[in-house]
Design a protein with these regions (language model features):
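Non-catalytic, solvent-exposed segments at the cell envelope interface
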Residues: 1-402
Length: 402
């Protein structure tokens, strides 16, 4: 039987809960959740349609990875100074689960994207100032302030949620935050994961991380370094790092879903203790119910997509393109997003065409997104620091052994 190897870390989290009904009461106490409705102004948010339930409607989740490197999180050679010791969001995904539970799209938002960040309330009663053309991951930092505890993380997630809604006009139902130190523990609880490394990594100046090209087995610390590294590989951009993070997520999900770890208390504990969530999805019954509802999603109906973007005037920043608007509109309307149309070709070797090309072009047409074949080629190369966006990743069985 084919394994659903392409689920993101979100999907791993969802599925472990559905496998753990026998331990609900014990597990519930391990998830930290906050009610952020009190600090989100309903007047400033896109509308939602009743009933206020996951049943029978599309679900939009914001999944964030935090990047505090203080204390136990400082496992990759960084110094844990003020710049990295406070809570920061290094990874952001808008995960759309279709109303019919037959399709999942996960859209990565580059942290260096320039966006308008609204004023945000925090759980400690303060408010932050609005920013025009702020760096996307500053939204999380604004909400979290100088803190790195769970309450600061929840406030950071709330401000990021408001920023995403302002940029996309999509109502975000819930958030899930996964800390990077937790990522290391989850990989270790899996016994490590295999990743196909396309280009050797050598970062002597910043983290000291080295990784050879080819199929490599990563333990928790190596996986964390692989997910974080920007120097000593490729063009050093956040866009190329997103591609590596997506590959690692798929490898983790593949390992979890192809073994019996989903029912092992060590894996459940290490996974769930890494989470900070909004109130509804932090309740085991709701999380488990969502898990059961997506069990029938086919491997060919799960897409990782990088938000279409281009270089900004500042060569170290990117801005959303018109293609990004089409992607967000497709999700808002609960329509398929063409993998090819969502993100043009990169400098990597192109994927081989398959029999689904015609149907994907039709899906793109339905979603209001032009198929890749009709898009005009770029007239110039991207500026330094802003690599071409990565194509959507179709989950496939890895040639790297599990």
């Amino acid at each position: 039987m084919a394994r659903r190897a392409g689920f993101s870390l979100l999907a791993v989290t969802v599925f472990v809960v559905s496998a753990a009904g026998f331990a609900w009461h014990n597990i519930q106490s391990r998830i930290t959740w906050f009610d952020i409705d009190s600090i989100l102004s309903e007047n400033d948010r896109p509308g939602t349609k009743p009933p206020d339930s996951y049943d029978g409607r599309a679900v939009n989740l914001l999944v964030l990875g935090t990047d505090s490197r203080a204390g136990d999180n400082n496992v990759d050679g960084s110094q844990g100074d003020d710049e990295v010791s406070v809570a920061r969001s290094d990874t952001a995904l808008v995960v759309h689960i279709s109303a019919d539970r037959k399709r999942i799209d996960a859209v990565s938002i580059p942290r260096d994207t320039l966006v308008d960040i609204p004023s945000c309330k925090t759980l400690d009663g303060n408010s932050t100032g609005a920013e025009e053309d702020g760096q996307f991951n500053s939204a999380f930092a604004n909400g979290a302030g100088s803190g790195s505890d769970k309450k600061a993380v929840a406030s950071g997630a709330a401000c990021t949620l408001k920023t995403v809604e302002k940029m996309t006009n999509i109502r975000i139902d819930d958030f899930i935050v996964i800390d990077f130190n937790g990522l290391s523990k989850v990989v270790d609880s899996l016994g490590g994961v295999h990743v196909q490394v396309d280009e050797a990594i050598d970062d002597p100046d910043y983290t000291g991380f080295k990784l050879d090209e080819g199929c490599q087995k990563l333990d928790g610390q190596a996986a964390l370094q692989y997910a974080r590294v920007r120097h000593g590989v490729g063009d050093g951009s956040d866009i190329s790092r997103i591609s590596r993070q997506q590959k690692l997520m798929s490898a983790m999900a593949s390992k979890a879903l192809s073994s019996n770890v989903l029912t092992q208390s060590g894996f459940l504990t290490s996974t769930l203790e890494t989470l900070t969530t909004s109130e509804r999805i932090g309740q085991i019954g709701n999380l488990s119910g969502l898990a059961y509802s997506v069990q029938g999603v086919g491997i060919d109906k799960i897409n990782f997509i990088t938000m279409p973007n281009e270089a900004a005037a500042d060569e170290n920043r990117v801005i959303p393109t018109e293609g990004a608007k089409k992607v967000w509109k497709a999700l808002e309307q609960d329509k398929p997003v063409s993998a090819d149309a969502a993100a043009p070709a990169t400098t990597d070797a192109p994927a081989t065409a398959d029999d689904s090309a015609t149907s994907e072009e039709q899906n793109a047409e339905d979603a209001g997104v032009e198929p890749a074949a009709t898009q005009a080629p770029a007239t110039q190369s991207p500026k330094a620091g802003a690599s071409p966006q990565q194509p959507a990743t179709k989950p496939t069985a890895s040639a790297c052994p599990a």
